[in-house]
Amino acid sequence: MVIGLSTMLEKTEALFASDHASVVSMNLFVALLCACIVLGHLLEETRWMNESITALIIGSCTGIVILLISGGKSSRILVFSEDLFFIYLLPPIIFNAGFQVKKKQFFRNFMTIMLFGAIGTLISFVIISFGAKHLFEKMNIGDLTIADYLAIGAIFSATDSVCTLQVLNQDETPLLYSLVFGEGVVNDATSVVLFNAIQRFDLTNINSAIALEFAGNFFYLFILSTALGVAAGLLSAFVIKKLYIGRHSTDREVALMMLLAYLSYMLAELFHLSSILTVFFCGIVMSHYTWHNVTDKSKVTTKHTFAAMSFLAEIFIFLYVGMDALDIEKWDVVRNSPGQSIGVSSILLGLILLGRAAFVFPLSFLSNLTKSSPDEKIDLKKQVTIWWAGLMRGAVSMALAYNQFTTSGHTKVLGNAIMITSTITVVLFSTVVFGLLTKPLVKHLQPSSKQSSTTALQITLRSSFHDPILHEPLLSTQGQSEYDPEQHVSFRMFWKSPSRFTH
């Protein structure tokens, strides 16, 4: 009896210790998120930095500190899970992308976007897969199967164009922004559909019948996922329109929109469809129909709530990727063969550059043949910008790599460990190095005139104080004349007159 009671007390103490560790981890992570937001805002106007790179660097620095404190045992305060990423973090990002998209530009360039996002991703997938198979077999990095090589193609075909989109201006370059933005979403969806199809099929003996079945399954998922997203968006519009006749409730409207959007994502997961495509088109349909059936207060609330959720999810992902990159367990397996890991990373970066160029320039040429107006054509500078925008790799690549090459985030197999560490290296290098060069490159290729910059500033200020679509001010216009939009906010000014900045 005494032994049983002692065992129970030990288990209770261990449980409390575990709960306390979780609370400490969450406190630290929330504090880091706040730091990322503040520093990202302060560094927003710099020539090189953006919020994604800021979060990645803060995550890496935090990982180093934790690694030193733990005596080299761990650099993590949370365990990475691809389920956490795909079920909780990705939905708000993709839904907000569809909800905030400028539909006129998106559908005007829909065929070009699908050309880049679907056909282009397939071309990149083929080049990376066969290039990796041909080169990695010579390096003898481990027993990778044909399914692994095809998965590598899908993993590194998934782009992350956040850095470029933060630099581009929707009002100054609507065509370019629409193409980069639309292609990024369709690209992620295509990569995930390809990855899921690879895992579903037995690809040990590929023949024409399996290839046709694979292609048929791919287009089946694409079409059905889009249809489900459209249906979910229309259902939300119908429910909100019929449910609150004469008695609109902002709380219920916002809650219903959020839940129905998330339901569309989970239904796609339930039926093994592309949840990314589903929730993206659900967001587009909701912004076109559902949004106009709610009150003005609900319009303002949903617009900013969805944007804030998406923003937090993006920062969370980059922060964790930076922290997880220094996890000692992943690098321990490959420490005896660092040259192989560096070689694999270099080859993957080269294949990414080649795979991207192999479709951007030829498909741009084909797209230009169908355009009559010079404004609708993609000139060489725009093509280079589109090519560059897709060179960064992010959390989608990380999550897919974990899914393919690890079990519960861990692996002791050399080939799998090399692929995980190489994925981390490619994500870090492309996000930081390519990301740092993005601002000056885009500014050089797409210079904004002084007049257009002034116009964009005026548009931003008008939309900040009064949204013409909503017919409702977002901020109070009292004392508007005292507000100087070009005034630089610094810590020195904050300490001199804190009331001016806090009230």
From Swiss-Prot:
Q: Which residues lie within the membrane without crossing it?
A: 77-97
Where in or outside the cell is it found? Answer: Vacuole membrane
A GO cellular component annotation in the UniProt record: plant-type vacuole
Those parts of the protein on the Cytoplasmic side are 1-22, 73-76, 98-109, 160-174, 241-265, 327-345, 407-416
Report where it is expressed, by tissue: Expressed in roots.
Report the InterPro entries cross-referenced here. Answer: Cation/H_exchanger_CPA1 (IPR018422), Cation/H_exchanger_TM (IPR006153), NaH_exchanger (IPR004709)
Task: Spell out the Pfam families in the cross-references.
Answer: Na_H_Exchanger
User: Quick one: where is this thing mainly located?
Assistant: membrane
Glycosylation sites (chain numbering)? 50, 293, 368
Q: Has keyword Kinase? A: no
| UniProt KW keywords | Antiport, Glycoprotein, Ion transport, Membrane, Potassium, Potassium transport, Sodium, Sodium transport, Transmembrane, Transmembrane helix, Transport, Vacuole
What membrane topology was assigned to this protein in its record? Multi-pass membrane protein
| A GO BP annotation | response to salt stress
Indicate the transmembrane segments per the record.
23-43, 52-72, 110-130, 139-159, 175-195, 220-240, 266-286, 306-326, 346-366, 384-406, 417-437
- Free-text function comment from the UniProt entry: May act in low affinity electroneutral exchange of protons for cations such as Na(+) or K(+) across membranes. May also exchange Li(+) and Cs(+) with a lower affinity.
The family annotation for this protein states: Belongs to the monovalent cation:proton antiporter 1 (CPA1) transporter (TC 2.A.36) family.
Q: What is this protein called?
A: Sodium/hydrogen exchanger 3
